[in-house]
Amino acid sequence: MIRAELDKDPRDVAAMFDSIADRYDLLNRVLSLGRERYWRQATVAAVDAYSGELVLDLAAGTGTSSESFTRRGARVIACDFSFGMLRVGAERRGGASRKGVTVVAGDALHLPFADQTFDAVTISFGLRNVHDVDRALAELLRVTKVGGRLVICEFSHLPVQPLDRMLGWGMKIGLPWVARQFSDNPDAYAYLSESIAAWPDQAGLARKISAAGWSRVAWRNLTFGVVALHRAYRER
């Protein structure tokens, strides 16, 4: 079985996501009990992309989330370092540049884009898997235009610690078990539950975003804090 460890070696993480690409979107819906769609809708609303804007959807996976940003006329670059994920998404859309979405292979720590390229940048359920989060946040700032915005949708922590520990225990046991019913690589989902447990809480991530140079950092909880939506701006 292919899985990554919490040191998040980029090659291991990419190989792990390659191995689950074919059924990734289905498993997301099952494991989130259908809440994944609501979380993505909240992310689209927070990005608030409109006609003429260019959006970077980093860690886009199969590009399911990317298509949502095009509904008001924005153009989207779907960037991911898992070739397996990008391949599955391109096959579903009928090409690497279709329906307002252009697929680009890239590393969050070395984004293949010029300074101040994007009006908005966003990453959903992917920042947690990056080897160097601080550097990735700085790279996202670099490629964002002055006045542009950042939206991060990521698993987080319930504000009541005993409940958060119970949820973490349930995910540690439940995610791999459910994944076994649908995936050839359930070990990958053991890594995902471990990475969620090790992730900073809402305030901790907000501090990281501010330290990277972003301004007006704010967040709100989705599903009681199971997921948090952070938003920030590049002011200079």
Swiss-Prot record:
Superkingdom per UniProt: Bacteria
Catalytic activity annotation: a 2-demethylmenaquinol + S-adenosyl-L-methionine = a menaquinol + S-adenosyl-L-homocysteine + H(+)
Keyword Translocase in record: no
MF GO annotations: demethylmenaquinone methyltransferase activity
EC numbers for this chain: 2.1.1.163
Residue sites binding S-adenosyl-L-methionine per the record: T62, D80, D107, A108, S124
Keywords, sorted A to Z: Menaquinone biosynthesis, Methyltransferase, S-adenosyl-L-methionine, Transferase
InterPro entries linked to this entry: SAM-dependent_MTases_sf (IPR029063), UbiE/COQ5_MeTrFase (IPR004033), UbiE/COQ5_MeTrFase_CS (IPR023576)
Signal sequence bounds: none
GO biological process: menaquinone biosynthetic process; methylation
Pathway where this protein functions: Quinol/quinone metabolism; menaquinone biosynthesis; menaquinol from 1,4-dihydroxy-2-naphthoate: step 2/2
Purpose: Methyltransferase required for the conversion of demethylmenaquinol (DMKH2) to menaquinol (MKH2).
Annotated family: Belongs to the class I-like SAM-binding methyltransferase superfamily. MenG/UbiE family.
NCBIfam families associated with the record: MenG_MenH_UbiE, PRK00216.1-2
Protein name per the record: Demethylmenaquinone methyltransferase
Taxonomic source organism: Thermobifida fusca (strain YX)
Gene of this entry: menG
